[in-house]
From Swiss-Prot:
UniProtKB keywords: Cytoplasm, Methyltransferase, rRNA processing, S-adenosyl-L-methionine, Transferase
Any one GO MF annotation of this record: rRNA (guanine-N2-)-methyltransferase activity
Family: Belongs to the methyltransferase superfamily. RsmJ family.
Subcellular location(s) per record: Cytoplasm
Protein name: Ribosomal RNA small subunit methyltransferase J
Membrane-spanning residues: none
HAMAP family (UniProt xref): 16SrRNA_methyltr_J
Primary gene name: rsmJ
Length: 261
């Protein structure tokens, strides 16, 4: 991750009824609760949960994690099921739902897709604020009767993915999934909006080769790396094969075949 000056943030309650929750989030994230005229982002706590808003006249609007409605709900209902490229990349097949470690969870979109297909997914996110958004989204998902069974298959860990993988305790994931932060060519409004949040807070994953090395050491069956379609492979071993879509590519590093069980 790049080492740039950290942006200024403050926590804001959107209503009087959310003041106590805002205080708890401010304490937990180590952020000021009072208004800051020089803040670049506001962490807002409202009736609909946690969201982050880039401040200023050209703000793209708030970013939050919502697995119940919006894009995640649409993809869950109409996204193509096990025929999706991500499903093929991680090895979803009839009778096979691999255990997946999503080591670059972000806002959890890919992890949710895999969990909706029946995979047990452990998500790791190292940026505390992004992890907080994801935690909040998962908590709300667990209260929805339609989405709760999917959210129950998702476990969130905070921390540095490479360190967690090197010190992994217990049964290894069958698949480690990586989607390192690189300059994205996707021009959709949603991606551009999220990138404006992620870039200042997270930066690019310049340690991607170390992540790949740790993933290859941990995964029992395969490592999958999501990349922009025309981007070079991550420095290190070459993938066994790739699956290519319109804007993205999945580089697959197989170790052994996934079996039913």
């Amino acid at each position: 991750m790049t080492d740039s000056a950290a942006p200024r943030l403050h926590v804001q309650a959107l209503s009087a009824g959310c003041a106590e929750a805002a205080r708890r989030w401010a304490e937990r994230l180590g952020l000021p609760l009072a208004a800051d005229d020089e803040a670049e982002f506001a962490v807002q706590v409202g009736e609909q949960g946690l969201q982050v808003l880039q401040l200023g006249a050209d703000s793209p609007g708030p970013v939050r994690v919502d697995f119940v409605e919006g894009a995640s709900a649409h993809r869950r209902k109409f996204g193509g099921g096990s025929g999706q490229m991500i499903a093929k990349a991680v090895g979803v097949q009839p009778g096979i739902r691999p255990r997946v470690l999503d080591a670059t969870a972000g806002l959890g979109r890919d992890g949710f897709v895999l969990a909706s297909l029946g995979c047990e997914v452990t998500l790791v996110e190292r940026q505390p604020l992004i992890a907080a958004l994801l935690e909040d989204g998962l908590e709300r998902a667990r209260r929805d009767p339609d989405v709760a069974p999917i959210a129950a298959r998702m476990r969130l860990l905070g921390g540095n993915s490479a360190d967690l993988m090197r010190a992994w305790d217990g049964e290894a994931p069958q698949v480690v999934y990586l989607d390192p932060m690189f300059p994205h060519r996707d021009k959709s409004a949603l991606v551009k909006k999220e990138m404006r949040l992620f870039r200042p807070l997270v930066g690019d994953d310049l340690d991607a080769p170390a992540l790949l090395q740790a993933a290859l050491a941990l995964a029992s069956h395969r490592v999958v790396v999501k990349r922009p379609r025309k981007a070079p492979i991550i420095e290190g071993p070459k993938p066994g094969y790739s699956l290519e879509g319109k804007s993205s590519r999945y580089d697959i590093y197989p170790k052994k075949a996934l079996g039913k069980g």
